[in-house]
Amino acid sequence: MVFVYLFFFVIGIIFGSFFNVVGLRIPKKRSIVQPRSHCPHCGHFLSWYELIPIFSYVLQKGKCRSCRVPISAIYPVMELITGLLFVFSFYKIGFSKELLVALPFVSLLIIITVSDLSYKLIPNRILIFFFVLFVLLRTWIPLHPWYDSIIGMTVGFILLYIIAIVSNGGMGGGDIKLFAVLGYALGLKGVLLAFFLSTLIGALFGLFGIITKQLSRKSAIPFGPFISIGAVLSYFYETEIFHWYIQLII
């Protein structure tokens, strides 16, 4: 079993490296194939050993081998998180068909986190790709009842759209469409829980930032990472969280 976990971790960090490329290039409308990976500062094309996920960053001490400019920590961090999420997905779900939903689900969240942190943008191309993928997957591996996906998508979109109107643009269009996509994968209860958790985590982060004077009340904070955390917790722990809440209020 250790080798299986190791396999998912290695596959995860490899895909994590690719997701970094997708999250950084697609918002700029650049090809994810050409040009090949290079230093954004000096243009140095990376050798194969400079592309090894996580380890190349450590071996190069976080700097470009050519110009010595520091490499963004987002690369190894997101690679590591992807590897851990792939392992955790298998740990929670095992070799079942739902794993084919879980892995794309966490993949979407990694990509939009990279994109939102880097540009405060969640591209439509990414959302459309994963929406089509989830429609196909949920047709084969449906929620119960099957129409829960449609309800989750509709409620996710409307809920965020209303908040965007009430907050006068406080919620971006990418966040609205993202919740619609997540709603299709999660269903009604899942998307509502994801919304609650992401809002709670985002609010606590903002409050902490204001208390420590790292943020002001007018600071623009990308909401994508908080959506990702809330969605992951909802996807893997929906039943446990609702059970805990019911026990709490009874």
Feature roles, as predicted:
Residues 20-26, 61-69, 109-119, 161-170, ...:
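C-terminal ends of transmembrane helices
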